[in-house]
Amino acid sequence: MCVFAKPGFFDEGGCARVRAAMDRGRAEAAEIYVGGYVVDKNVRRTFDVAVDSRTVGIVERAFANVRAEVSCFFGETLSAAEGPGFLRYPTGGFYRAHLDRLDEPGHEFSRRVSLVLFLTDAGRGVGDGRCEGGWLRLYGVVDPAQETVPLDISPAAGTLVAFRSHLLHEVLPVTDGVRDAIVDWFY
């Protein structure tokens, strides 16, 4: 299987601290890339949250520390990261099926591996650190010849998931509560 998963990458306290930093941060509607960056709430209903530099640094170091393990898992050298994005999906939030790979001319880097660090749990009711829905759905993982067969991954706080950036994927709608996650991309 071509999905890397590392439960317990962040402990419960670490997840809570990042969620608290997100609560203090400034949230803006997340953009999509279609030849340029635009907000389209029919495709993505998510917020990018600007957090303090200390929190960004903690996450950057954690991701840098796991990069060699992820490189080994995928069998390729990954030498850099784009930088973490802190995403908040409120009730009704989603991100339709898309690719993370940006291979258009003029892009300095080509995303090769996508990272998602879940900060909330799904399926245990709602409240601090919990939501309903918001599953990560990956296509073409179970059988690459059948790109329509999905693999659904339920958010579990502290779990890091990595997959190739060319895989079609989406975030299913959050039906109750808030889904928080951190994303990044290795090159």
Protein language model features and the residues they cover:
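Fe(II)/2-oxoglutarate oxygenase catalytic core
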Residues: 1-162, 166-187
